[in-house]
Amino acid sequence: MMFISGRRALLAISVLLTCLAVSTYAEQSGATPALTYDAQTRGPVPIPPSERTLQTIVAEPWFKVSDQAIVLEGPAFDRNGNLLFCDVPGQRVLRLTRDKRLSPVVHLDDVSPGGLAVHKDGRVFIAAMNLVKGTGSIVAVKPDGTGMQTIVPAAAGYMPNDLVFDARGGLYFSDFRGISTEPRGGAYYFSPDAKTITPVLPHLAMANGIALSPNGKDLWITEFSRNLLHRVELADATTIAPIGTAITYHFTGPAPDSMRADSDGNLYVAMYSQGRVLVFNKNGIPIGQILLPGRDEGHNLESTSMAIKPETNDLYIVTSDGNGGQGATIFHAKVFAKALLLYSHREQK
């Protein structure tokens, strides 16, 4: 017993001496532990640790749309090689020709365009919303902006954000309704005969980006308000295959916006308020990222969407600098694979 007590006493003395030594060293050196910013944590939107080792490139400025910080959205190439995109606050769809001449296509009343998809007959389908009123619609116009048709009326109750055609001419669209704790949006399918709208993946919080795999059997949706990437395996256009849904990725920070697929099935997701595009393989595994110039200093963070030019691997990213003073710009980068053959560029029968 005395031996055990002696050992305990020695242990207590040893601990006391160690504490005194550490205390004396801290007093002498003034070395109180402190967190400090470094190159990886400085700036408004540092790359999350899990994404820092991804293959990374920096896009180049390609076209200055405006010196004003207008929000750009929804780029899509038409059958003539023109780049169409949305001026959200101006409620306009714009056209940029191959020789970089900019002109308006159409102006919308009471709603702002946010997503575009081109039909193989040349018509431009436009997803548009009024965020203040919580309403939205899908309309279509001829290539010159005339002949506007209502495809999905505001009375249907959706807030269409983005859209993509399947090979049959049916239209998937995302519904931007809801908040993170009240998921009222989702992904829907508008049939090729224009008769029915069918829910495919309901109960999402601000469903945003939507894309199809090259074989048309996987539907991808980003959930803006809950930072999720969903994959839906389709048995047919509106039926989910058994064990066919998965959340393949949880994003960090704000916020997954629009996305596009390439011919290899890779996905490109615009990270709104982060000034970058995250790239995933066909299984939803991150494999790369594209950064926009100036993002570490808080510039060009409002990256919303992108388009891959047909028959090339040229990616064009639309963004705004917000209050940073650099206006609204389209950036360019080369990506893993060529553009997916979209419905817009399929041969008409």
Short names for language-model regions:
Residues 92-94, 137-139, 186-188, 228-230, ...:
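A short loop-to-beta-strand structural motif that recurs across blades of beta-propeller domains
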Residues 88-89, 130-136, 178-185, 224-226, ...:
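Short, solvent-exposed loop/turn segments at conserved positions within beta-propeller repeat blades
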Residues 65-80, 109-136, 154-171, 178-179, ...:
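Beta-rich, blade/repeat-based domains predominating
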Residues 43-69:
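A short helix->beta-strand "capping" segment at the edge of beta-propeller domains
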Residues 307-349:
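Blade-level signature of beta-propeller repeat domains, shared across WD40, Kelch, NHL, RCC1
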Residues 60-65, 101-107, 147-153, 196-201, ...:
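A short beta-strand motif characteristic of beta-propeller blades
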Residues 232-240, 334-340:
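Short loop/turn segments immediately following beta-strands, especially the blade-tip
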Residues 12-21:
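Bacterial N-terminal signal peptides
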